[in-house]
C-alpha cells in the first residue's frame, strides 16, 4: 500500500503498527507533543513501570529553560551551555556517557561548487581547536575522530581524513587550481575563494567555533562569513539545503558498512560525487564478508574526502541526560535502542 507507506503516520498514531511496550495515546503535531501509554497488546513478560511518557520537541534554549523550571523530568543534550545551566540543580543529576555521533563541518557542494575551495577548507581547519572550544567547559577529552562511519572504538575504524593540513597545504591546493592572492584572500576569475557558514541561534560555543574557523581559513586566504539564522529555521534551512556550509551532527551506526550510502553517493549529495565511489558503495551490499565490507567502506570514505570533500568530522563528544534524581534506568546508552532491546523502556521508572 504505497499511500499507507508514504502517509500512514502523518498526524496519525496508527496504533495497530506499534508492537512495543508503549503505544501512542495522544499525538499533537502542531504543539510537537506526543504522549505514550502502556500497550495493552504488549507480548513481553515484563510490563512497563511508567504509566505514560510525554515527549516534547523543542530547541535547546527552550529545553534548557523548561528543565530549570521543573517542566521536564529528563532532557538529553550534548552542549556545554546546557551542561553549565542545569548542573547542580536541586533534586537533579547529570548522567554522562559516550555520544555515538559525530560533529562535522558540512558543505553543500551544489553551492560551494569548486572542489579546490572545499579541499582547501578541509586542509585549513584545525580540528583540534574546534574540539577544544566544544569540550573545554565540560572537561571532556577524546581522540580526534577521522570518520563519519564509525566511532574510534568500533571494529574496523580508520582515520580517513586527508593528512596534509594547515594553511600552507590549503594555499597550495588553491594555487594549483589557478587561484592567486589578492590582499588577504585568494581569487580566481574575479571571484573570491570563500563561502558562508550557516549557524543557528545564539549558543556561545557554536559562535566560538565559527570564529575559530573564520580565523583559520583567513590565514589560508579563504573568506568566510557567518549566516546566523534563528534556531527555529533549522529544519527549513537544512531540509532545503539553503546553506553553503554548516556545522552539523550525525548519528553513528553500529555497523559502519551500512553507512556509506547515506553520505557518499552522488544521489545523496544532489548529483555531486564520483562514479568510482558509487561503484564501490554498490559493491559493499554485494559483498558477503563483513571484514571485506568494512575495508570497502573505509576505501569509499578516504576517496570521498580526497575527491569530493563534503563532510569533515571534528568531534564525537559526550552524551548527557539531565534527569530528576529519582528517575531510574534512564540515561546515555551507547548503541542500545528499543529496536534492539524491547526492555529498554520497560525498566524505566521512579524510585
State the predicted function of each range.
Residues 29-31, 180-252:
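Ligand/substrate-recognition segments at binding pockets and active sites
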Residues 38-85, 223:
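Ligand-site clamp/hinge motif
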Residues 125-156, 205-214, 238-351:
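Detector for C-terminal structural segments
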Amino acid at each position: 500500500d504505497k499511500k499507507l507507506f508514504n502517509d500512514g503516520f502523518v498526524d496519525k498514531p496508527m496504533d495497530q503498527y506499534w508492537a512495543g511496550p508503549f503505544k501512542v495515546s495522544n499525538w499533537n503535531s502542531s504543539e510537537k507533543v506526543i504522549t505514550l501509554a502502556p500497550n495493552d497488546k504488549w507480548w513481553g513478560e515484563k510490563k512497563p513501570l511508567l504509566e505514560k511518557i510525554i515527549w516534547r520537541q523543542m530547541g535547546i534554549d527552550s529545553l534548557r529553560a523548561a528543565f530549570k523550571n521543573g517542566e521536564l523530568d529528563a532532557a538529553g543534550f550534548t552542549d556545554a551551555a546546557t551542561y553549565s545551566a542545569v548542573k547542580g540543580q536541586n533534586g537533579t543529576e547529570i548522567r554522562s556517557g559516550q555520544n555515538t555521533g559525530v560533529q562535522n563541518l558540512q558543505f553543500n557542494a551544489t553551492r560551494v561548487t569548486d572542489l579546490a575551495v572545499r579541499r582547501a577548507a578541509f586542509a585549513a581547519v584545525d580540528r583540534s581547536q574546534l574540539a577544544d572550544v566544544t569540550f573545554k567547559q565540560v572537561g571532556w577529552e577524546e581522540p580526534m575522530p577521522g570518520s563519519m562511519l564509525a566511532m574510534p572504538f568500533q571494529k574496523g575504524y580508520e582515520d580517513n581524513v586527508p593528512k596534509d593540513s594547515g594553511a600552507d597545504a590549503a594555499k597550495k591546493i588553491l594555487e594549483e587550481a589557478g587561484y592567486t592572492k589578492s590582499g588577504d584572500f585568494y581569487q580566481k576569475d574575479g571571484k573570491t575563494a570563500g563561502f558562508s557558514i550557516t549557524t543557528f541561534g545564539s549558543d556561545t560555543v557554536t559562535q566560538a567555533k565559527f570564529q575559530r574557523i573564520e580565523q583559520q581559513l583567513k590565514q589560508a586566504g579563504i573568506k568566510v562569513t557567518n549566516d546566523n539564522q534563528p534556531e527555529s529555521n533549522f529544519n527549513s534551512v537544512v531540509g532545503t539545503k539553503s546553506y553553503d556550509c554548516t556545522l552539523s551532527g550525525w548519528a553513528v551506526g553500529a555497523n559502519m558498512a551500512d553507512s556509506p550510502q547515506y553520505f557518499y553517493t552522488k544521489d545523496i549529495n544532489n548529483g555531486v560525487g564520483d562514479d568510482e565511489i558509487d561503484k564501490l558503495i554498490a559493491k559493499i551490499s554485494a559483498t558477503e564478508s563483513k571484514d571485506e565490507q568494512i575495508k570497502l567502506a573505509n576505501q569509499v570514505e578516504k576517496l570521498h574526502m580526497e575527491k569530493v570533500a563534503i563532510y569533515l568530522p571534528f568531534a564525537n563528544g559526550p552524551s548527557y541526560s539531565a534527569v530528576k534524581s529519582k528517575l531510574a534506568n534512564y540515561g546515555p546508552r551507547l548503541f542500545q535502542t528499543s529496536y534492539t532491546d524491547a526492555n529498554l523502556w520497560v525498566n524505566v521508572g521512579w524510585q
